[in-house]
């Protein structure tokens, strides 16, 4: 009998739904999925294919003078494909008026309405569910967008790194007015719940060093959501692996009995039992607000979420040897964290130009560059 190669520790380029459909047919099972989908309506990553047309050198750009590069020179130097990343309105959407070519694009986030974007996201996660273990979990970090009458503004890419900025999306749905916060994270969470997922928790990613914003009629955005969902009511979750240290004051209170704590059914008055009063608790269940600095990674596009952010997801959602999936692998952060903790990984990515960066990061022990407040990414335009 011919020996088959295990489908693990690989990243496939192309449409993630087609890839996951193939994996499902091959019997692939993953224990957890940790991912950060594209922001809605903020970036065209240049993955479109143009068919036909009378000029093979045409870039299909409406106004070249408005083309903007990312501010990370190291990235621009090492990743020429992303150097061409532009805000969506600079490209012709369907047919190029310069050369007559028609556009075919598999990227998500460029839909005409938020509802269409959510519909596509739900479909992606149906494919995730097909290869997720019955006791598996899904962790989604997703950012929001603002509606506006202007063109899409800079937000430095996919969810996970940048902050929501004003003048963002001119693709709006029913009832959405200019300057409205669209509510993409909760639209997605509720849609996934409606589609059969168990919506278990909203986790707040608090950013102590948020990217500044130039708006003057609201507060600077300094958080994003991570949603924890499960396939079934009962699922694998190793809370012990992500316990956090208990503050000295709390330990003292527990030991002295000055706090309240339910030990078992025999102590319904919530007082500590005599036995538990003498126990010093060194840790507690992890809270749902995670303070993690925005952290650049030299050579990556801005949307790399910090490895410290998803480390608890990997540890709580899987065991050593399990497979961790990311259908929007990008620069390879999820794979790097999985490998660091003796997990296997599977990933999908539409843009093949990420290949060399992914390989570099998976091999690297670097958890990101030190936070430098003078970095250009922390300066608003």
Task: Please state what every model-predicted region is.
Residues 1-381:
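S-adenosyl-L-methionine-dependent nucleic acid methyltransferase catalytic domains
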């Amino acid at each position: 009998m011919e020996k088959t190669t295990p489908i693990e520790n690989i990243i496939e380029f192309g449409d993630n739904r087609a890839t996951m459909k193939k994996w499902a047919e091959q019997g692939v099972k993953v224990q957890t999925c940790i991912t950060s989908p594209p922001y809605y309506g903020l970036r065209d990553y240049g993955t479109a294919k143009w068919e036909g047309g009378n000029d093979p050198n045409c870039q299909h750009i409406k106004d070249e003078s408005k083309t903007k590069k990312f501010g990370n020179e190291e990235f621009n130097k090492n990743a020429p494909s992303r150097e061409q990343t532009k805000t969506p309105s600079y490209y012709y959407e369907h047919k190029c008026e310069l050369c007559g070519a028609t556009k075919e694009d598999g990227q998500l986030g460029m839909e005409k309405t938020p509802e269409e974007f959510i519909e596509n996201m739900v479909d992606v996660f149906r494919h995730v569910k097909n290869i997720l273990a019955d006791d598996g979990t899904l962790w989604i970090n997703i950012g929001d967008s603002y509606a506006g009458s202007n063109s899409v503004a800079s937000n430095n890419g996919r969810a996970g790194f940048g902050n929501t900025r004003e003048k963002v999306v001119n693709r709006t749905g029913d009832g959405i007015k200019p300057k409205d916060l669209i509510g993409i994270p909760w639209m997605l969470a509720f849609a996934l719940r409606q589609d059969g997922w168990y919506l278990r928790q909203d986790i707040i990613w608090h950013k102590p060093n948020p990217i500044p914003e130039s708006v003057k009629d609201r507060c600077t955005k300094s958080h994003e959501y991570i949603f924890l969902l499960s396939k079934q009511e009962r699922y694998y979750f190793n809370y012990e692996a992500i316990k956090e240290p208990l503050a000295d004051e709390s330990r003292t209170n527990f030991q002295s009995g000055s706090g309240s704590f339910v030990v078992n059914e025999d102590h319904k008055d919530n007082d500590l039992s005599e036995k538990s009063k003498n126990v010093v608790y060194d840790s507690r269940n992890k809270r749902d607000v995670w303070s993690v600095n925005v952290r650049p990674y030299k050579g990556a596009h801005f949307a790399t979420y910090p490895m410290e952010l998803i480390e608890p997801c990997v540890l709580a959602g899987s065991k050593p040897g399990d497979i961790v999936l990311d259908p929007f692998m990008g620069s390879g952060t999820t794979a790097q964290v999985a490998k660091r903790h003796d997990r296997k990984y599977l990933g999908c990515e539409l843009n093949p130009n990420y290949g060399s960066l992914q390989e570099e990061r998976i091999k690297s022990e670097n958890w990101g560059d030190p936070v430098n407040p003078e970095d250009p990414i922390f300066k608003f335009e």
